[in-house]
Design a protein with these regions (language model features):
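Extracellular calcium-associated, cysteine-rich motifs in secreted modular proteins
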Residues: 1-170
């Protein structure tokens, strides 16, 4: 029988979503996706149905240039540096670490592509810090493993001589 007895422009609904299969210009309640029960309308004409939870659903039904938001953070994948992480969106220095300090693996130095972490919180990035786990030391000029800061822990008494680091006799 006629599934749309009160609508003379429709009579069949193959996918059972309640929208008719007839696509003619005069048809009302027509289904833009007659073979897909999860989709029926495409407002922006991008080929992705307006139901975001349907098959290849459009999370941005009024923007024909955007449709997918994999992490459901409200930012289209094309505009999201981290399309699979809802806690991060932007990476201004393109180092692979997100700029949101409260997000997953945040970039402590969002404007420096060579730094992203500061484990000891001494304001010197781990890559430039000779002692990334000791906030009292950052540099080791002679490379002997003892820090140059004379007031820091394990201080090098001879920061320019790699063969000496301690002065036990004062």
């Amino acid at each position: 029988g006629d599934l749309f007895s009160n609508n003379p422009t429709q009579w069949a609904d193959r996918d059972g979503d309640g929208y008719g299969d007839n696509q003619s210009e005069t048809a009302t309640m027509s289904d833009a996706f007659s073979a897909d029960g999860t989709q029926w309308n495409d407002t922006d004409g991008d080929g992705h149905g307006d139901n975001p939870y349907g098959t290849q659903g459009d999370w941005f039904p009024n923007d024909a240039t955007r449709w997918q938001d994999s992490d459901r953070d409200g930012v289209a994948d094309e505009d999201d540096a981290f399309p699979n992480d809802s806690s991060q969106i932007i990476d201004l220095d393109n180092d692979g670490y997100g700029d949101d300090a409260n997000g997953t693996d945040p970039d402590v130095f969002p404007n420096d592509p060579t730094e992203w972490a500061d484990t000891d919180d001494d304001k010197v990035g781990n890559n430039a810090d000779a002692f990334p786990f000791d906030p009292s030391q950052q540099n080791d000029s002679d490379g002997d493993g003892f820090g140059d800061n004379e007031r820091g822990s394990g201080a090098d008494k001879f920061p320019n001589d790699s063969t000496q680091w301690s002065d036990i006799d004062g």
